[in-house]
Amino acid sequence: MTVNRPRGTRDFLPADTARRRYVESVMRNVVRNWGYSEIITPTFEHLDLFTLKSGEGIVGELYNFTDKGGRDMTLRPELTAPVMRLYVNELQPFPKPLKLFYFENCFRYERPQKGRFREFWQFGVELIGSGKSDSDAEVIALADALLKAVGIQGDMKLGNLAVIRTLLKGLEPEIVSKVMRLVDKKEYAGLESLLEEIGAEEQLKSDLFHLIHLEGKYILPKVKEIVGNIPELVGFEKTLKLLDAYGVDYSLDFGIARGLDYYTGMVFEVYAEGLGAQKQVCGGGSYQLIQLFGGGDVPSTGFGIGFDRIMEICPLVPPASKNLVLVSKPATHIEAVKVASELRNYLPVQIDLMERNFKAQFSYANTINADYVVIVGEKELEAGKLTLRDMVSGEQELLTLEEIIEKITGQQD
């Protein structure tokens, strides 16, 4: 019987894995330089964690199950809610703001397509405990810095949900949620039908459609004509000035609503070319989610980067590392093991594990593109030396182990 991997998942071969780990390390270094610390949360959580405020779209895609104790559990579909749960359980006494990041796999039962999988990896940041404009600006600027560090120049769109909610303040909360979802998906025909169905005033319909179609860097005066100079826009304008100071390139789009119901104010998304229909590589915003899980009314800002989508268009490749194969005969194999142990302090080393003859060992070294071969022969050992062959140039030298180490480490530098 052949058992294949589940639909919507992937296997990563050594070269793919090395590249992913390298890009991941670049991103980790960036966020650490901004003062963020890594956390890890469980792969599965209680179902309630995600049904409270994640939105209908995500709830319908959960990999949920009942465990042997009769508890409703689910594989995590995203990581903001688990981080908030972690904060309530463990981190409330810590000094604010808390600056956290994570890199974990998530699971959603959705139709697999280019750039979208049922198991996917998310790199994210959460800044907990500050609702100031400076915090929003830092988080957005950090997202921008991360994408630039991996060679991606994205198209950043910023909005503020307080603007749309000001327009919709006379509607029932469930209607507001429906409107926000339709706006987020840009289902304008469905939005128009919903507004007709609830008997919305013509002025509301006109203002809403005008607002969500406004785009550009300098549209705030037009936005104020629609909703007035509401307090949320004062802080938002300060955020924009700070982003200009950070050197972040952005445009405003008040049609951004995000697919998660817990965002409250500033929201942003970043799009990149080369991904087909799934162009979004990063999204986030400000939220107040902690009180849902038993904590206080703590403002937070964060974002998630779709790591799998990043990898489809990221130009980074790991720097090449030298590798070496030791060739020996049965009579010198023990010495070869000792030599390998010493050389592994300086570069990756492989020895023969298949009892191959000399010719087959050299053939294997060629097959794996080894940079060097060290021959551990009886004559070499009698002379207290080894033969180093450069597999690129073909040059061969009889050297002591110390000379080989010096030569190899010098070439690596």
Curated annotation (Swiss-Prot):
<dbReference type="InterPro" id="IPR033656">
    <property type="entry name" value="HisRS_anticodon"/>
</dbReference>
<dbReference type="InterPro" id="IPR041715">
    <property type="entry name" value="HisRS-like_core"/>
</dbReference>
<keyword id="KW-0648">Protein biosynthesis</keyword>
<dbReference type="GO" id="GO:0004821">
    <property type="term" value="F:histidine-tRNA ligase activity"/>
</dbReference>
<dbReference type="GO" id="GO:0005524">
    <property type="term" value="F:ATP binding"/>
</dbReference>
<dbReference type="GO" id="GO:0000105">
    <property type="term" value="P:L-histidine biosynthetic process"/>
</dbReference>
<dbReference type="GO" id="GO:0006427">
    <property type="term" value="P:histidyl-tRNA aminoacylation"/>
</dbReference>
<dbReference type="InterPro" id="IPR004517">
    <property type="entry name" value="HisZ"/>
</dbReference>
<protein>
    <recommendedName>
        <fullName>Histidine--tRNA ligase</fullName>
        <ecNumber>6.1.1.21</ecNumber>
    </recommendedName>
</protein>
<dbReference type="Pfam" id="PF13393">
    <property type="entry name" value="tRNA-synt_His"/>
</dbReference>
<dbReference type="InterPro" id="IPR036621">
    <property type="entry name" value="Anticodon-bd_dom_sf"/>
</dbReference>
<comment type="similarity">
    <text>Belongs to the class-II aminoacyl-tRNA synthetase family.</text>
</comment>
<keyword id="KW-0067">ATP-binding</keyword>
<dbReference type="Pfam" id="PF03129">
    <property type="entry name" value="HGTP_anticodon"/>
</dbReference>
<keyword id="KW-0030">Aminoacyl-tRNA synthetase</keyword>
<keyword id="KW-0547">Nucleotide-binding</keyword>
<dbReference type="GO" id="GO:0005737">
    <property type="term" value="C:cytoplasm"/>
</dbReference>
<keyword id="KW-0436">Ligase</keyword>
<dbReference type="InterPro" id="IPR004154">
    <property type="entry name" value="Anticodon-bd"/>
</dbReference>
<dbReference type="InterPro" id="IPR015807">
    <property type="entry name" value="His-tRNA-ligase"/>
</dbReference>
<dbReference type="InterPro" id="IPR006195">
    <property type="entry name" value="aa-tRNA-synth_II"/>
</dbReference>
<dbReference type="InterPro" id="IPR045864">
    <property type="entry name" value="aa-tRNA-synth_II/BPL/LPL"/>
</dbReference>
<dbReference type="InterPro" id="IPR004516">
    <property type="entry name" value="HisRS/HisZ"/>
</dbReference>
<keyword id="KW-0963">Cytoplasm</keyword>
